[in-house]
């Protein structure tokens, strides 16, 4: 069994149920997060947790679903679908794990362009709300 497929269970159990406290244990201290709306990588556990928490608030988790997964070695690719304000969002989470099951790289890609615009709008709202 691939290690990534073992590690992903904690992600599913917690993120999909809005439990963001688990991010403190699953994220590596030096994780790098790549947002679909920010060009450069976002470095560190605290900033990655902030962005993933905002994503959880932005991505309409009631309609959010992972529809396909591929795991190989220490890599996972999870395709997701959701609707945000009636705009269909399709994307992938690309996760790289270390040997202990901590996330060291997390990249989110989104399509179509209209969805990217909506994700950007909602992420800004969520980040402002969380930061205040």
Place the predicted regions along the sequence by residue.
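A beta-strand edge to alpha-helix "cap/lid" segment located at domain peripheries
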Residues: 56-132
């Amino acid at each position: 069994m691939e290690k990534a497929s073992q590690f992903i269970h904690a992600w599913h159990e917690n993120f999909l149920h809005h439990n963001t406290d688990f991010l403190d244990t699953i994220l590596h201290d030096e994780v790098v997060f790549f947002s679909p709306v920010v060009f450069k990588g976002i470095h560190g556990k605290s900033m990655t947790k902030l962005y993933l928490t905002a994503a959880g608030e932005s991505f309409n988790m009631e309609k959010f679903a992972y529809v396909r997964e591929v795991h190989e070695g220490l890599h996972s690719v999870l395709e997701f679908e959701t609707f945000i304000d009636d705009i269909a969002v399709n994307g992938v989470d690309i996760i790289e794990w270390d040997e202990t099951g901590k996330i060291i790289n997390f990249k989110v890609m989104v399509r179509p362009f209209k969805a990217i615009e909506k994700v950007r709008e909602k992420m800004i709202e969520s980040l402002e709300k969380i930061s205040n």
